[in-house]
Amino acid sequence: MEKNKTRIGHVISDRMEKTIVVGIDVAKRHPLYKKTYRRTMKYLVHDEKNEAKIGDMIEIVKCRPISKGKYWRLNRIITKGHIVAA
């Protein structure tokens, strides 16, 4: 495990207890056609205090495995998001 590996993304879902889903946009280049395309990587992140909400921009840090798919934890909330009711 790499030390101090951090990423910045936005919260997609906060419906689980102590867990949030974070989306991180990644730009990749096709190896043959050289076209750049975007993908959103989704990570399960441990949020001990349930403080992050949908739309927040957050920083996550890699940690020991907490469950089968959860090995990132919330480091800090950079900006609070706002939810627009439809």
Curated annotation (Swiss-Prot):
TM spans (from-to): none
UniProt cross-references to PROSITE patterns, sorted A to Z: RIBOSOMAL_S17
Top-rank lineage group of the source organism: Bacteria
GO molecular function: rRNA binding; structural constituent of ribosome
Gene Ontology BP, a term: translation
Keywords tagged on the record: Ribonucleoprotein, Ribosomal protein, RNA-binding, rRNA-binding
GO cellular component: cytosolic small ribosomal subunit
Family per record: Belongs to the universal ribosomal protein uS17 family.
Protein purpose: One of the primary rRNA binding proteins, it binds specifically to the 5'-end of 16S ribosomal RNA.
Assembly: Part of the 30S ribosomal subunit.
Protein name, per record: Small ribosomal subunit protein uS17
